[in-house]
């Protein structure tokens, strides 16, 4: 009997730990959020860019039918009408094709899933043709009725955990995830996505749901689909949106036993550092000592679709594409550092925080256009196509799991470190030049700086760095240079 109980406990432990595995294909790293992209465009991007440049995965916008709102703001995607797979990004057939095409080139798909709530008042018509009556909590496309929701009340006090989890977030009708029928419908939706080949989920508004209810839902999920190249017994990678900056009733530690969390403190802290509010020298102990969750429980990012607009956590300290030099430096630090699972933001340009993606006619999403230097146009920012970012994904892949060594700083805002003997990176956020002889940890030779250029055959399109037989190199980053960072690695040796 004791042995049987032990086996059951071990089996549960194995299941529990499986959902912290990203399910990335071997030798790849870095997830990119292709915010509001169409499924057909993501499929092509996997084949033409993400696969060849070593990216591991894509977080996609919500896939299920949402309320059609006037002016088509981005946030309409977070107002579910049903779990039918039809949005402005495409229909179920297009979604399924995208997942297969991306998996075929080693790029995994992670879906932003919204099941804390349904659409708020005014969301009466959906992108798939379904109708709803939010005022009476009727969503026949699922179907959900008033029996499936918590009582109507507003969240006004974030120090009251019951209110945060049982009341309505900005008027969005709050589903009762403790209701077995609601659980069944959510699990059905998620398992359908698993059947189609997805690798995991970003759970929107997880903080607003009871951890015990989420545990039941996650525990009911199928194993990943082996027809899409996943190992037998693999479980969905789960990232829960939990904004925890401290000082509230709800803590991320309530959720880290269930899956990873979105580590908003990382975004806030990296923004403060590269905006010059904290000196870079203090990044020497970057990680849990900064108040972050454990590395394997932390999805880390410089910005996300909410806080780049001033929503969520971080405020004015959050770095975005609008301050490109500091943004590239912070992104390079995130990708060079072993802490956490990094996610790169890929935005569309905006001046109004409600503004939706570029369209062809005010309704239908426009495809991005690509320039000869890999960058995007047509209203799409495509940070993931910036050389300084995609080459750092290559850096991360080259250094693997090697530890940080050879930390150097000038006592201020110039820092450098190696990743074992495979990669080296240096930063200058001071208002004067960096010119120092630094230990790189790398074998002797000449290397291409993958920030200013790329290796092309036996030559380099940017700066080169010569490492001596003692591992040292003269590192130079001028304060007025476009990029305040330099990076070399073994795969960029000339």
From Swiss-Prot:
CDD domains, sorted: AmyAc_bac_euk_AmyA (cd11317)
InterPro entries with a match to the protein in the record: A-amylase/branching_C, A-amylase_C, Alpha_amylase, Glyco_hydro_13_cat_dom, Glyco_hydro_b, Glycoside_hydrolase_SF
Chain positions recorded as chloride binding sites: 202, 304, 343
GO molecular function, one term: metal ion binding
One family name in Pfam for this protein: Alpha-amylase_C
Cleaved signal peptide residues: 1-18
Enzyme kind, highest EC tier: hydrolase
Keywords carried by this UniProt record: Calcium, Carbohydrate metabolism, Chloride, Disulfide bond, Glycosidase, Hydrolase, Metal-binding, Signal
Skewed-composition ranges (Low complexity): 351-363
The protein's Enzyme Commission number: 3.2.1.1
Region (Disordered) residue spans: 350-370
Family to which this protein belongs: Belongs to the glycosyl hydrolase 13 family.
This protein's name: Alpha-amylase 2
Example of a GO biological process term: carbohydrate metabolic process
Disulfide bonds: 46-102, 153-167, 376-382, 448-460
Enzyme active site: 204 (nucleophile), 241 (proton donor)
Known catalytic reactions: Endohydrolysis of (1->4)-alpha-D-glucosidic linkages in polysaccharides containing three or more (1->4)-alpha-linked D-glucose units
Sequence positions that bind Ca(2+): 116, 165, 174, 208
Assembly, per entry: Monomer.
């Amino acid at each position: 009997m004791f042995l049987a109980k032990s086996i059951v406990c071990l089996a549960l432990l194995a299941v529990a730990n499986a959902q912290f595995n990203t399910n990335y294909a071997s030798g790849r790293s870095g997830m990119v959020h292709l915010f509001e992209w169409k499924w057909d465009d993501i499929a092509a991007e996997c084949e033409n860019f993400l696969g060849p440049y070593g990216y591991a995965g894509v977080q996609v916008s919500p896939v299920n039918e949402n309320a059609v709102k006037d002016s088509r703001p981005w946030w309409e995607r977070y107002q579910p009408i049903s779990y039918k797979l039809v949005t402005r990004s495409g229909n179920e057939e297009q979604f399924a094709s995208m997942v297969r095409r991306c998996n075929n080139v080693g790029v995994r798909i992670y879906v932003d899933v919204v099941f804390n709530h349904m659409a708020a008042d005014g969301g009466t018509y959906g992108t798939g043709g379904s109708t709803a009556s939010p005022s009476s909590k009727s969503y026949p496309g699922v179907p959900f009725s008033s029996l499936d929701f918590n009582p109507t009340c507003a969240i006004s006090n974030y120090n009251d955990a019951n209110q945060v989890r049982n009341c309505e977030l900005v008027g969005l009708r709050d589903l009762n995830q403790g209701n077995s029928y609601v659980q069944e419908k959510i699990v059905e939706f998620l398992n359908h996505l698993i059947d189609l080949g997805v690798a995991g989920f970003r759970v929107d508004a997880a903080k607003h749901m009871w951890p015990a209810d989420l545990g039941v839902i996650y525990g009911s999920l199928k194993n990943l689909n082996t027809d899409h190249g996943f190992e037998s017994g693999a479980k969905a990678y789960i990232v829960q949106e939990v904004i925890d900056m401290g000082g509230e009733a709800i803590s991320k530690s309530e959720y880290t036993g269930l899956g990873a969390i979105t580590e908003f403190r990382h975004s806030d802290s990296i923004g403060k550092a590269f905006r010059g509010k904290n000196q870079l020298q203090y990044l020497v102990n970057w990680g849990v000592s900064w108040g972050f969750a454990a590395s394997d429980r932390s999805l880390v990012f410089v910005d996300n679709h909410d806080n780049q607009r001033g929503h969520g956590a971080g405020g004015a300290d959050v770095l975005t594409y609008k301050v490109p030099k500091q943004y590239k430096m912070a992104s390079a630090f995130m990708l060079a550092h072993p802490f956490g699972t990094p996610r790169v933001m890929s935005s569309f340009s905006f001046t109004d925080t409600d503004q939706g993606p570029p369209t062809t006619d005010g309704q239908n999403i426009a495809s991005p256009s690509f320039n000869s230097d890999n960058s995007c146009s047509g209203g799409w920012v495509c940070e993931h196509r910036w050389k300084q970012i995609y080459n750092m994904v290559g850096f991360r892949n080259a250094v693997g799991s090697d530890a940080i060594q050879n930390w150097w700083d000038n006592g201020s805002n110039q820092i450098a470190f190696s990743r074992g003997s495979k990669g080296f990176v240096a930063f200058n956020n001071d208002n004067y030049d960096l010119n120092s002889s630094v230990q790189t940890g790398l074998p002797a030779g000449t290397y291409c700086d993958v920030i200013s250029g790329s290796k092309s055959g036996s030559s380099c399109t940017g700066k080169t760095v010569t490492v001596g037989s003692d591992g040292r190199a003269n590192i130079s980053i001028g304060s007025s240079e476009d990029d305040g960072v330099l990076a070399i690695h073994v795969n960029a040796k000339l």
